[in-house]
From Swiss-Prot:
Protein name, per record: Progonadoliberin-2
One annotated GO molecular function: gonadotropin hormone-releasing hormone activity
Keyword Secreted annotated: yes
Highest taxon of the lineage: Eukaryota
The entry's keywords: Amidation, Cleavage on pair of basic residues, Hormone, Secreted, Signal
InterPro entries (UniProt xref): GnRH, Gonadoliberin
Protein role: Stimulates the secretion of gonadotropins; it stimulates the secretion of both luteinizing and follicle-stimulating hormones.
Subcellular location: Secreted
Expression across tissues: Midbrain.
Organism: Tupaia belangeri (Common tree shrew)
Signal peptide segment: 1-25
Gene Ontology CC terms: extracellular space
Length: 114
């Protein structure tokens, strides 16, 4: 048992002595100074980081929604969407039903020419 413990300690000492130094995956605070300031040569420096090119004004304007370019169903308010596809006969029937339920006098039927 003593020899296995000695072997383990010897292996641990060998690994610690042969350590190559800091790895590429360093702690998040590497390169930071007290007060939240970064070292200017730090790879996390915002000036040294590559940034994607900014989109052109035309691309930005094209990404915004326009009422002129909206599809017809998007331009109809939600109240009108429920009856937008209904025929005139269905709408008249709905109005008669609502008016008769409210107790209002029933309007005369208007003949529809086919």
């Amino acid at each position: 048992m003593a020899s296995s413990m000695l072997g383990f300690l010897l292996l641990l000492l060998l690994l610690m002595a042969a350590h190559p130094g800091p790895s590429e995956a360093q702690h998040w605070s590497h390169g930071w100074y007290p007060g939240g300031k970064r070292a200017s040569n730090s790879p996390q420096d915002p000036q040294s980081a590559l940034r994607p090119p900014a989109p052109s004004a035309a691309q930005t304007a094209h990404s915004f929604r326009s009422a002129a370019l909206a599809s017809p169903e998007d331009s109809v308010p939600w109240e009108g969407r429920t009856t937008a596809g209904w025929s005139l006969r269905r709408k008249q029937h709905l109005m008669r039903t609502l008016l008769s339920a409210a107790g209002a006098p029933r309007p005369a039927a208007v003949p529809i020419k086919p």
